[in-house]
Amino acid sequence: FLGIVAVLIIIFLIWQFTTTLVVIFALASIFYTLTSLYKLVAGYSALEHRYLIDTSPEALDLMDERTLPMYTILVPLFREAAVIPYLVQGINSLDYPKTKLDVRLLCEEEDDETYQAIIDQDLPPHFNPIIVPASDPQTKPKACNYGLQGAKGEYVVIYDAEDRPDPAQLKKAVLMFDNVDESIVCIQAKLNFFNQQTNFLTRWFSIEYSMLFDLVLPGLDARKDPIPLGGTSNHIKLKELVEVGAWDPYNVTEDADLGVRLHQAGYRTTMMN
């Protein structure tokens, strides 16, 4: 279909260049205006959205750690040797029983430097370095799918190598899963930059992330619309993740794609405050 559209555009550009450009820009402007209006509606919905689950430190202190489920953490890695010490430190700082963690560091077969950096860390038993065999496509979603083999957790979360997750994030997710409707099988944590004050670029990125994760996505949550997941800190029930086919290894926006497919399967995603 897209090929046919491209051919038609080329034909019309040759035939009526100026008119075709005007039509293309007009259609693009209409599309941009409609998406902007939709974001405004979602943002307005977010202002009235209330998080019904109490995930305050006081509520987390009441949780019985003996009843906490196993949690699988997937960390896809490629040429990340420099940040491995910080990654291990960040995961070790998670306030969750280490005996109930299944941490899977997914390293591409060709990436000897990152794998050696992992080995040099003298990792505790709950860390499991996994070499992802070289094959096409060499993508993050393919690595995550490979890492699901033999996963021990009831829940799965993805972290990127540079992430610094809230130490209480896993407990918050478990508390929410225990108290929300069973149709909710995915929880997306809010994301932002930890170095937002470094320069203008990081400030701009931080503003964009704040708009998405503090307004647009909570608004979609309030409206029960599909939520395009962020690429990290999304917590998913393993059973339902496998049921919908996990991640599409050929999709470069595998996170957003998974959020839509979960919705199509009749499941819901909610936001973690």
Set out the residue ranges of the language-model regions.
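Acidic donor-binding segment of Leloir-type glycosyltransferases
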Residues: 92-136, 178
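N-terminal membrane-anchoring/stem segments of glycan-assembly enzymes
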Residues: 1-65
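Cell-envelope/extracellular polymer assembly enzymes that use nucleotide-activated donors
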Residues: 69-72, 102, 242, 257
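Long helical/loop segments within the catalytic core of UDP-sugar-dependent glycosyltransferases
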Residues: 120-154, 167-252, 263
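Short acidic donor-binding/metal-coordinating loop in glycosyltransferase active sites
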Residues: 161-163, 254
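Catalytic donor-sugar/metal-binding loop of nucleotide-sugar-dependent glycosyltransferases
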Residues: 250, 259-273
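N-terminal signal-anchor transmembrane helix
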Residues: 37-73, 78-100
